[in-house]
Amino acid sequence: MDMLLNTARAWGLRLDQRQIEQFARYSAELRAWNTRVNLTAITDEEGIVARHFLDSLRCALSWGDAPSSLIDIGSGAGFPGLPLKILRPELRVALVESVGKKAAFLRHMITVLDLRDVTVLTARAETVGRDPQHREQYDVVTARAVAELATLAEYCLPLCRVHGRVLAPKGSDIADEVARARTAIERLGGRVIDVEPVTIPGVEPRTLVVIAKVAPTLAAYPRAVGVPARRPIH
């Protein structure tokens, strides 16, 4: 876990001994569960630290004013939501994962890591986005490797409060994807404020798309389950 500690420190993020132990346990449990549930193609500890933990923690440099709540869309094995919860234990976190076996892993990790104020929602993002308990209730919305940005915007922006942020970790060559998504982002009440380069030791260059929520999302969005992916807003 030296790379985790040292890179986090270089980014100005402090991790204490308990947090390092939580990350070590997370890595071990992820590898154990991965033998029976398809959670990740990355199974060596160094890869898990670099491509999952550090890629997740990098979001904390871009979430603006200290948030009190975060929702992670398509959480899968918990990235980036759970590492950000470990980093900031005071965060109220919701993890949206529609696949039952992956949701079971998330609940297991919450128990094993003794995390408080974390909810797992076994549902589709479109359904959660229409629920008054969740709609426009979160300071930060994250989503990693879920969909193209135009579709992702329709999953995420309805859940983000005005003045909050959507953070979308992406690969390096995304200029065209961002351009295709601008109409959708603006219609949903957002604005792209940055596309930040991300450098992680041993990992190919990545980016983080930062979207500010500048206006409420129209009641027509999100559309029915499956529609944002089949017919993105253009």
Curated annotation (Swiss-Prot):
Gene3D superfamilies referenced in this protein's UniProt entry, alphabetically: Vaccinia Virus protein VP39 (3.40.50.150)
Entry keyword 4Fe-4S: no
Organism domain of life: Bacteria
Keywords, sorted A to Z: Cytoplasm, Methyltransferase, rRNA processing, S-adenosyl-L-methionine, Transferase
Keyword Methyltransferase assigned: yes
Top EC category: transferase
Residues noted as binding S-adenosyl-L-methionine in the record, renumbered to the chain: 74, 79, 125-126, 144
UniProt-annotated location(s): Cytoplasm
GO molecular function: rRNA (guanine-N7-)-methyltransferase activity
Pfam families named among the record's database cross-references: GidB (PF02527)
EC numbers on record: 2.1.1.-
GO terms for cellular component: cytosol
InterPro entries per UniProt: rRNA_ssu_MeTfrase_G, SAM-dependent_MTases_sf
Family according to the record: Belongs to the methyltransferase superfamily. RNA methyltransferase RsmG family.
Physiological role: Specifically methylates the N7 position of a guanine in 16S rRNA.
Protein name, per record: Ribosomal RNA small subunit methyltransferase G
Species of origin: Roseiflexus sp. (strain RS-1)
Phylogenetic placement of the source organism: Bacteria, Bacillati, Chloroflexota, Chloroflexia, Chloroflexales
Gene field: rsmG
